[in-house]
Amino acid sequence: MENEITKLIDEVKQFTIDRDWDQFHNPKDLAIALSIEASELLEAFLWKSPEDAKTEKIKEELADVINYALLLADKCGLDVAAIVREKMIRNAKKYPVDKAKGVATKYTEL
């Protein structure tokens, strides 16, 4: 899996290098772009039931979100697999199965 993540990062980086876009990719602007793409993902669901959302639009916007997240992590020198695992460990402590299973309650209210 980690090898696949590294390959994806390399592919996305090469895409931007080939177009000389890397000069525009600083952490601030990548975070802003990620947020904008996340909003476009939300737009796929706006005024629709979840079942009516268009799968192709979701795939397109989700790919943009992931691409910017990968670029941001790389630009900040972060290991994507490691930070996801670290966050899952923190989440497991905040949301123990015996208290959080089947409920949508925030950890501060469990």
Residue ranges and their predicted role:
Residues 1-110:
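Flexible "arm" and connector segments at domain edges
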